[in-house]
């Protein structure tokens, strides 16, 4: 046997032993480790782990998020918006939900959102629909009765877009007076007005059999927790939106 064949057999023997060693690393061992969460990032947009075969899977439930700056996520990246983080929280807890379809713009009042819905060509119905609207009605001193009338009109549109009962969520209006932007304003007056609008929202949800979640109290923590506000000193940071997402998941889905 020449030297080349001896070296070749030696290499093969070492390789075989290494591959069959009980200490060799198995991918499933890594991915099951709670401290190893790279899949949380790589699977964010797809809503699944990269080691899952989704080629033959059924499409996950659809999600339509309606609102204003608080839904579009003014001042944060798209993946930090509360609807996107809500999907992440759901997926992490084993409930697959598709990435959100968002109809929202900074500055929108109820009738702006209503007009946008009227002008949108919807091609399907949705499994989950959220509504977070009203802060700009309050900020611009619009009558609360106008707000209530618009809510009824919005619900008519939403009912035509939902797949089933129990799928619509009403979210309370955050208290922007607790942000640095509201520091030199009458915070008590702002809170009183926000509470009035939210009482109307909660009553509206109860009358129509809709789920309701309060994120206002989370927003009021911003007075003592500046990291809950983004760099514009007004809108929530991704951290606050994560707090919302967790609470919304527990109330709406879990």
Question: How should each PLM-predicted stretch be described?
Answer:
Residues 99-101, 167, 209-211:
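Conserved beta-strand segments of alpha/beta enzyme cores
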Residues 175-254:
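Catalytic His-Asp segment of secreted/periplasmic serine-dependent ester chemistry enzymes
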Residues 146-149, 153-157, 196-203:
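Alpha-helical scaffolding segments of alpha/beta enzyme cores, especially the outer helices
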Residues 161-167:
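A short helix->loop->beta-strand "cap" motif at the edges of active sites that frequently abuts
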Residues 132, 171-172:
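Alpha/beta-hydrolase-fold catalytic nucleophile elbow
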Residues 62-64, 70-153:
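Conserved SGNH/GDSL esterase-like catalytic core that processes O-acyl groups on lipids
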Residues 23, 109, 137-139, 174-177, ...:
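Feature marks short, surface-exposed loop/turn motifs that line or immediately flank catalytic pockets
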Residues 1-66, 71-77, 91-97, 224, ...:
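N-terminal secretory targeting modules
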